[in-house]
From Swiss-Prot:
Protein's UniProt keywords contain Magnesium: yes
Physiological role: Component of the chaperonin-containing T-complex (TRiC), a molecular chaperone complex that assists the folding of actin, tubulin and other proteins upon ATP hydrolysis.
The name this protein goes by in its record: T-complex protein 1 subunit delta
Alphabetic keyword roster: ATP-binding, Chaperone, Cytoplasm, Hydrolase, Magnesium, Metal-binding, Nucleotide-binding
Compositionally biased residues, Polar residues: 1-15
Species name: Takifugu rubripes (Japanese pufferfish)
Positions of region (Disordered): 1-26
Keyword Chaperone: yes
Subunit structure: Component of the chaperonin-containing T-complex (TRiC), a hexadecamer composed of two identical back-to-back stacked rings enclosing a protein folding chamber. Each ring is made up of eight different subunits: TCP1/CCT1, CCT2, CCT3, CCT4, CCT5, CCT6A/CCT6, CCT7, CCT8.
InterPro entries: Chap_CCT_delta, Chaperone_TCP-1, Chaperonin_TCP-1_CS, Cpn60/GroEL/TCP-1, GroEL-like_apical_dom_sf, GROEL-like_equatorial_sf, TCP-1-like_intermed_sf, TCP-1_chaperonin
Length: 536
């Protein structure tokens, strides 16, 4: 009997008379667990922030290795199990989509803000008050950032180059920034109209990776570049090209799976072969009749896209053939050369063809060949960037670096304003938000002050990664900014503090604003969670 009483009394702990659940510590424990997991993710990428940041080597289950210091790439490939840690991975992805750069900064800021939240919660401040105060702080922060930004014109090539170079400085391929930065700026400028553009469709800039050579061999091509080889090597150069793109096969038609053809003697066999020959010859004649002298053939999985007989006839008619065109490349090809995809031979007419000055197969010094189509008459503005490198790791990191540089220029097209780099905006925010907190009262002032202190993590981490003393560096920066020197930032090259605008370390305003707002939104979301429930 006493055992029964003990059991019933144990089951009633945590419940009051009305049967409502009362576990005072549980929400606090859940918050602490969420904050700890998210901070662990932020700490993992913190060392890769800035031009002197370290790189990460990531190995997947297949054994493939990636070397990078791009925050979005590191987090995307990281195995994260905790739900709130996954929120930081999503945060990095959101920053990558919105701005394309600042993917490490946004996670580091979020980690520092969560640390501040933890301290505020331990002092008994309610999560809702912290959340609302952080929203006030970020609204004020956006005002401060906008006030310290400088307008930029898209015609000012020098400023665009400085922004792209700053983005490339923290990458593995930073020593090639003098080549890759102008390439990125030129690529964006060729696919937009600077007077009217409000955004850039990066699908108009195709990055082609080709193994061999060095990054010095990267080039920008106004036109189309294909990694597929020319099928008939006797026709490898065509001037005044008329280009057709077919989505059907130049091979004998196959019977259905269920049907069979029984050939009883050799005359019937001969007739089948003659029919096949006539069928293919008619198709090739129709292609030639339309005036086509360069033919692209989409990859087919059902049967041979191009039979040997068809290739023989095309060769005789001096038509250059490139087969195995991938389905996802078709839209870009059509936009670049002004052709239309042809699904049936009956639709193969002159108006479906695209035109170009020159189509040729180019040899790459013993490391394969590329097909280049230049002088395209199409109104669709597109460019191709050929990325070369000695191995797969270098090529992939170069591609990511070029993508980040393109995104930086896209940010300047979207919001035409620049801001200093080198931790200057974050320290300016910390100083101005500390002043703003004095105008508030009660708990809000305390929370905004904690928010401003958290932003010091960026200059502190930059200094730490560059081998400087973070405490003395941040203290000196605070003094300079308090005296009104808004552009004082960490000069990683010289190892000290200087006017960062004079050093041409600049970044788009959109990157800073996006990082601040997205990090704050994520922190507020994590802060509001007081329970984790496993669904069935």
């Amino acid at each position: 009997m006493p055992e029964g009483k003990a059991t019933s009394s144990a089951s009633n702990t945590g419940k009051n008379k009305g049967g409502a659940y009362q576990d005072r510590d549980k929400p606090a424990q859940i918050r602490y667990s969420n904050i700890s997991a998210a901070k662990a993710v932020a700490d993992a990428v913190r060392t890769s922030l800035g031009p002197k940041g370290m790189d990460k080597m990531i190995q997947d289950e297949k054994g493939d290795v990636t070397i990078t210091n791009d925050g979005a790439t590191i987090l995307k490939q990281m195995q994260v199990l905790h739900p709130s840690a996954k929120m930081l991975v999503e945060l990095s992805k959101a920053q990558d989509i919105e701005a394309g750069d600042g993917t490490t900064s946004v996670v580091v800021i979020a980690g520092a803000l969560l640390d501040s939240c933890n301290r505020l919660l331990q002092r008994g401040i309610h999560p809702t008050i912290i959340s609302e105060s952080f929203q006030k702080a970020v609204d004020k922060g956006v005002e401060v950032l906008t006030a310290m930004s400088q307008p930029v014109q898209l015609g000012d090539r020098e400023t665009l180059l400085n922004s792209a170079t700053t983005s490339l400085c923290s990458k593995v391929v930073s020593q090639y920034s003098s080549l890759l930065a102008p390439m990125s700026v030129d690529a964006v400028m060729r696919v937009i109209d600077p007077a009217t553009a409000t955004s850039v469709d990066l699908h108009d800039i195709k990055i082609i990776k080709k193994l061999g050579g060095t990054i010095d061999d990267c080039e920008l091509v106004e036109g189309l570049v294909l990694t597929q080889r020319v099928a008939n090597s006797s026709v490898s150069r065509v001037e005044k090209a008329k280009i057709g793109l077919i989505q059907f096969c130049l091979s004998p038609p196959k019977t259905d799976m269920d049907n069979q053809i029984v050939v009883s003697d050799y005359t019937q066999m001969d007739r089948v072969l003659r029919e096949e020959r006539a069928y293919i010859l008619n198709m090739v004649k129709q292609i030639k009749k339309a005036g086509c002298n360069v033919l692209f053939i989409q990859k087919s999985i059902l049967r041979d896209a191009l039979s040997d007989l068809a290739l023989h006839f095309l060769n005789k008619m001096k038509i250059m053939v490139v087969k195995d065109i991938e389905r996802e490349d078709i839209e870009f090809i059509c936009k670049t050369i002004g052709t239309k995809p042809i699904a049936h031979i009956d639709h193969f007419t002159p108006e479906m063809l695209g035109t170009a000055e020159l189509a040729e197969e180019v040899s790459l010094d013993g490391s394969g060949k590329l097909v280049k189509i230049t002088g395209c008459a199409s109104p669709g503005k597109t460019v191709s960037i050929v990325v070369r490198g000695s191995n797969k790791l270098v090529i992939e990191e170069a591609e990511r670096s070029i993508h980040d540089a393109l995104c930086v220029i896209r940010c300047l097209v979207k919001k035409r304003a620049l801001i200093a780099g080198g931790g200057a905006p974050e320290i300016e925010l910390a100083v101005r938000l500390a002043e703003y907190s004095r105008t508030l009262g009660g708990m809000e002032a305390y929370c905004v002050r904690a928010y401003s202190d958290a932003l010091e993590v960026i200059p502190s981490t930059l200094a730490e990664n560059a081998g400087l003393n973070p405490i003395s560096t941040v203290t000196e920066l605070r003094n300079r900014h308090a005296q009104g020197d808004k552009m004082a930032g960490i000069n990683v090259r010289k190892g000290g503090i200087s006017n960062i605008m004079e050093e041409l370390v600049v970044q788009p305003l959109l990157v800073s604003i996006s990082a601040l707002t997205l990090a704050t939104e994520t922190v507020r979301s994590i802060l509001k969670i007081d329970d984790v429930v496993n669904a069935r």
